Amino acid sequence: MSQSSVRNFCIIAHIDHGKSTLADRLIEMTGTLRHDEMCEQVMDSMELERERGITIKAKAIRLRYISKDKQEYRLNLIDTPGHVDFSYEVSRTIAACEGAILVIDATQGIQAQTLANVYLAIEYNLEIIPVINKIDLPGADIPRVMGEIKSVLGYDEDSVLQISAKLGLGVPELLEAIVNKVPAPKGNANQPLRALIFDSHYDPYKGVVAYLRVADGNINKGDDLRLMGQGTEFRVLEAGYFAPAQVAALRLDVGDVGYIATGLKSVGECRVGDTVTLQHGGAIQPLIGYHPAKAMVFAGIYPTQTDDYHELREAMEKLSLNDASLSSEPESSPLLGHGFRCGFLGLLHLDIIVERLEREFNLSLVVTSPGVSLTVTRIGGEAFTVVNPNEMPLPHEIARIEEPWVSVVIITPSKYIGTVMDLVRENYGVYKNTEYLGQLAMSELGQRVQLHYDMPLRSILTTFHDQLKSRTQGYASLDYEFIGYRDANLSKIDVLVNDVPVDAFSRIIPPDKAHEIGEALVKKLKEMIPRQLYQVTLQAAIGSKIVARADISAKRKDVIAKCYGGDITRKRKLLDKQKEGKKKMRQIGKVEVPKEAFLSVLKLQ
């Protein structure tokens, strides 16, 4: 098929705006799958994706379409995740396309992540086709959403399509818009091969299977190829496309989206975003459009049973094969044994990795409290990165601490502006500006407002999103983007059990919250640690300063139970002996902190 008849496009949307359902209708209406082969969310092949109703990994599928003027087109649809944590996957996908269908829910309007993805598409010069979905729902407010699209994105009403992906309304018109508006790929078939890898997975028989978009030249089975970034060399064992299952083909031409089986044993050798070229006579300049994923959230993952460490290690290796944005390195804790310190794109990413480890590999896990990476400079001038609270130097050794900050966009009905501003202020947010979304965008909740803030990443790590949803009755949406490191006033709080620090309970916190957090920690531990034969002292400390304390009183054995009447000195002698024994026991005794105590402390936000 000629290059002019190829169209590469993706679907971008906020989470749950009907992106995967629209992909299903496009697959069905182009006859790519028979009706009996269809299932809901064809593109979401991972069980977890269907269950949660979200797209986690980018997918690709080739569609054959005959237009109204009887011309045949090859449409390559790349499905993308919508959640903020997976914006890295979105950026890779967008770099492989010429067009994007922007899906906006008729009941919800423009959301924060919709805007983030639109700006990304504009950055890569994609042709954007705006679509209002779910027009069949009773709550659809098309004039309001149309007003938002016009004022925020600048599209007039004539260029916005109205569809119902569920019922198939307006989808034939959308297919026509794709072939008429999305430009054909620009590459040159006579130039040396250049192809962008936008995803990959590990196959036990074929090695790493790389999903790619051919920008120049072509790929044939048996070609000797090289990755320009990594320098890895391999031979193409198989080339093909997705329909949506893998279909082997003799070759992939310029503009095609497909896959190659590389035979490589680790996705680490075949990094997503790299450029593939020929080993001999290959291209000199790699393709642009790649930003490496940067882990923003760190947490420790440990097996509940220490004997399961080897199974966890194998599971982490297998997940790393398919997830380029997951980083992990071994670490050990006196309380939890051996485990891994892992880096994630965000909290949903962490949640999904843990759920996949437990579900796919049948593991029972303990996950430590998530934190961010800090840049710490010692008084001598040496700077280093801290991802684990236990790596933090003593307060008197630290010259400065820097933490990651994010630019936050919150879209909310104007009715909730006050409560949202209070929430952000409580979490150290710095106000930037306010924008109103369109003149027509009014409802009983008031006009919708876009609030811009700068915030420390640690502030939105734990319960911020849940609190935002609960304070706005679910109407607010959130998006954030990393903007750099800024000076931070932070301290490490330690928990001491009988004057012995327990590493697993250490946290990095703002000093103004020290008393509140310290009290909560020792109170929870007092409830969970069983009583001993001697008094146990629990303390929360920053450096040498104790900020909270609780005592677990000793169990008392009645040593004078056998004494009946008689001289008091006999009883006193026994009580003094008991006191001495307890004192000695306290010096040499070791308090076993149960794992349940650790888990209950983790749940404290």
Swiss-Prot record:
Molecular function terms, GO-annotated: GTP binding; GTPase activity; ribosome binding; translation elongation factor activity
Key word Membrane present: yes
GO biological process per UniProt: positive regulation of translation
Catalytic activity of the protein: GTP + H2O = GDP + phosphate + H(+)
InterPro entries per record: EF-4, EFG_III/V, EFG_V-like, G_TR_CS, LepA_C_sf, LepA_CTD, LepA_IV, P-loop_NTPase
Segments forming domain tr-type G: 4-186
GO cellular component, one term: plasma membrane
Presence of keyword Protein biosynthesis: yes
Membrane topology of the entry: Peripheral membrane protein
Enzyme Commission code(s) on record: 3.6.5.n1
SUPFAM superfamilies noted in UniProt: EF-G C-terminal domain-like (SSF54980), P-loop containing nucleoside triphosphate hydrolases (SSF52540), Translation proteins (SSF50447)
PROSITE patterns given in the database record: G_TR_1, G_TR_2
Localization terms from the record: Cell membrane
Binding locations of GTP: D16, H17, G18, K19, S20, T21, N133, K134, I135, D136
Main location: membrane
The entry's keywords: Cell membrane, GTP-binding, Hydrolase, Membrane, Nucleotide-binding, Protein biosynthesis
A Pfam family this chain is assigned to: EFG_C
Function field: Required for accurate and efficient protein synthesis under certain stress conditions. May act as a fidelity factor of the translation reaction, by catalyzing a one-codon backward translocation of tRNAs on improperly translocated ribosomes. Back-translocation proceeds from a post-translocation (POST) complex to a pre-translocation (PRE) complex, thus giving elongation factor G a second chance to translocate the tRNAs correctly. Binds to ribosomes in a GTP-dependent manner.
Family: Belongs to the TRAFAC class translation factor GTPase superfamily. Classic translation factor GTPase family. LepA subfamily.
Name of the featured protein: Elongation factor 4
Protein source organism: Dehalococcoides mccartyi (strain ATCC BAA-2100 / JCM 16839 / KCTC 5957 / BAV1)
Organism lineage: Bacteria, Bacillati, Chloroflexota, Dehalococcoidia, Dehalococcoidales
